[in-house]
Design a protein with these regions (language model features):
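Short alpha-helix boundary/capping and kink motifs at helix termini
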Residues: 1-60, 73
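Short, loop-centered acidic/histidine patches that primarily coordinate divalent metals
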Residues: 49-51, 64, 85
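Short active-site loop/helix that positions an aromatic residue
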Residues: 58, 65-79
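Short hydrophobic/aromatic-enriched beta-strand-loop microsegments
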Residues: 79-85
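Amphipathic, charge-rich alpha-helical segments that serve as recognition/docking helices
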Residues: 87-89
Length: 89
């Protein structure tokens, strides 16, 4: 992943592609990341694994699910920095 290029995507789109529910706003990690956002601090990129729609495999959020949820609470149309890995079979 260290060689993966950092890209950006809209928070709600990543959540939708992962088929995961939005974590509660009062979940401890979401709450902590919301505080960081409100202080203007940058969040680390999330780590994703590309899914395969033809096989019914959704996007996998390997690290940063709570960060995506926090950004959704702040502004669901905000971009999220991410690094993507390919799904290996």
């Amino acid at each position: 992943m260290s060689r993966a290029h950092t890209s950006r995507a809209i928070a709600k789109d990543l959540l939708r592609a992962s088929k995961l529910p939005l974590l509660p706003r009062d979940e401890s990690h979401v709450e902590a990341d919301l505080k960081r956002i409100h202080k203007g601090k940058t969040l680390s990129p999330v780590l994703l694994v590309r899914g395969d729609l033809s096989q019914g495999i959704p996007l996998i959020i390997a690290d940063g699910y709570h960060r995506i949820c926090a950004i959704c609470y702040f502004d669901e149309d905000s971009p999220v920095a991410f690094r993507m890995a390919a799904l290996r079979r």
